[in-house]
Amino acid sequence: AIIDFDKRGRANFENLKNGRDINFATASFGHGVSVTPIKLLSAISAIANAGIMMKPYILTSDSPEAVKRVISEETAEKITKMMVSAIKKNVIADIPNYSVAGKTGTAYVPDFEKGGYTDDVLNTYIGFAPASTPKFIILIKLDKPAGAPLAGLTVVPAFRELAQFVLNYYNI
């Protein structure tokens, strides 16, 4: 069955509407903007699908549905190569004999009472495989990890284990 994710949460990019360079600069590393997990999956799936955003679904036999082109095929290819390169340099994420594309994310938790951010973090890792002909995309998210504030130490090993399982299970 397809779950309609279109109305589940909203990303917030209001900070970018004023066009200030500082807001664009800080948004490049995740400050002043927010995105839901499903929107993050949709964005990265557009990279995995040569620039075409797909309608998200979970474990269904229905055919994937293209929504629209959001970036050029060339841009998607360049970003994929960067994501593959990041994994090849990070032994924790690398899966031998496979080309996997992935990216870590570590974000500070907003302080809604005082403004700004708390010292707590959210760790994410998102990736797809095989990088050249993607069959799946995985997002691992961990809220406020204890003792290991960097995504590379928390969610990356979980991604690697799950991706290896999926690759083996489906004989990819």
Per-range role (PLM):
Residues 64-67, 156-172:
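Short, gly/Ser/Thr-rich active-site loops of penicillin-recognizing serine hydrolases
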Residues 1-144, 151, 172:
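Beta-lactam-recognizing serine transpeptidase/beta-lactamase-like catalytic domain environment
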